[in-house]
Each structure stands twice: as structure tokens, then as C-alpha cells.
């Protein structure tokens, strides 16, 4: 599934839009977190530390809902429903560094106790506003 052309600018590196990620807790209640993201080959990539709530939720229940909001107009956004297709530690440290450069303008400061992981999410439905 391809992103709506009207909202492709929200995916651009220079836009620095955040993605609000909704996952499901073990009891079925939602949990929402703002995250850094980028896209690759039509997939949405996020990065987290292993052991965090979203890491556990995504591994157990791969269905997600997301919103990417225009930083300059909060009423312009795209709602996405999708599912995790893959997660990997491979190149996760390099990926978080890329995201840190995008959002903070500086390299990521790795912590020795962190184990970064990339989640790849396939969009299944878009609703652009």
C-alpha cells in the first residue's frame, strides 16, 4: 500500500514529524507513544530499546495504529493502521543514530545497557486529513 501523495511531505527528512504509535497492552488496553521514524521500501521503521513496553507489546501483538501529524498544522495528519512484519537488532544502532541526526541534529549517545531494535511496520490502511 502506498502513502497518499497529499501527505508525502510528512515523511520527508526535513519535516521532522513525529509518529504517535498505539500498541495493545496484554489486557487489551491501548498504549500510545510518540516516536521517531523513517520509511524504507513502503514500510515504516521505528527504533526502541529492548524491554520497553512498546517492544513487548509489538512482539506479542503486531497490530498497530499510528498518526503522523504535520508539525506546522496539528489538524493536518495521516492516520495509519498496520502490522509489524519484522523486527531485528541488525543495524539498529546505526538506525537510531540516523534518527537522532534527523530529530536532534546530533549523533545518538549509546548507553552500554541498551539493546536497540528496529520494528518494520507495513501500512494496511490510510486516512488522510
Per-range role (PLM):
Residues 1-5, 76-129:
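Charged, gly/pro-rich active-site loop segments
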Residues 1-19:
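Extreme N-terminal tail/first-helix region
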Residues 10-11, 36, 56, 108-111:
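Short secondary-structure boundary/capping segments
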Residues 11-14, 57-58, 99, 121:
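A generic structural signal for nonpolar/aromatic side chains embedded in well-ordered alpha-helices
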Residues 16-50, 58, 64-68, 79:
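Short beta-strand segments
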Residues 27, 52, 125-127:
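Glycine-rich nucleotide phosphate-binding loop and flanking beta-alpha elements
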Residues 27-29, 70-74, 112-113:
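A short beta-turn/loop motif at secondary-structure boundaries
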Residues 52-54, 73:
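Short, surface-exposed beta-strand-loop junctions and turns on beta-sheet-rich folds
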